[in-house]
Amino acid sequence: MEAKAILRTARISPQKARLVADQVRGLSAERAVNLLKFSDKKAAHLIKKVVESAIANAENNQGADVDELKVKTIMVDEGPSLKRFMARAKGRGTRILKRTSHITVVVGAAK
């Protein structure tokens, strides 16, 4: 029995979010939330909300025991980029890409 939660177009670079996602992949759900709670990275707060949502989905929709859940898969995919313009010297301009991420968390029973 698995439950899934998805956060789409989170305003964080996928490269930065994957650093945090790699830390919690495979951990028990309770341990993952505790680890994310005390991390000072922006991605940790976003991923913590998605993990808690997946845990709530498993508990409410499928009646799973929260103590037996673990983070089975966590994926951080690239979302649409916001294109911005920054003025530079001598009338030039450069393009800035504000990257977004799609964060997917699947929790399931630890066997």
Curated annotation (Swiss-Prot):
GO terms for molecular function: rRNA binding; structural constituent of ribosome. GO terms for cellular component: cytosolic large ribosomal subunit. It comes from the Bacteria. One of its GO terms (biological process) is translation. CDD domains: Ribosomal_L22. This protein binds specifically to 23S rRNA; its binding is stimulated by other ribosomal proteins, e.g. L4, L17, and L20. It is important during the early stages of 50S assembly. It makes multiple contacts with different domains of the 23S rRNA in the assembled 50S subunit and ribosome. The globular domain of the protein is located near the polypeptide exit tunnel on the outside of the subunit, while an extended beta-hairpin is found that lines the wall of the exit tunnel in the center of the 70S ribosome. This is Large ribosomal subunit protein uL22. The lineage of its organism: Bacteria, Pseudomonadati, Pseudomonadota, Gammaproteobacteria, Lysobacterales.
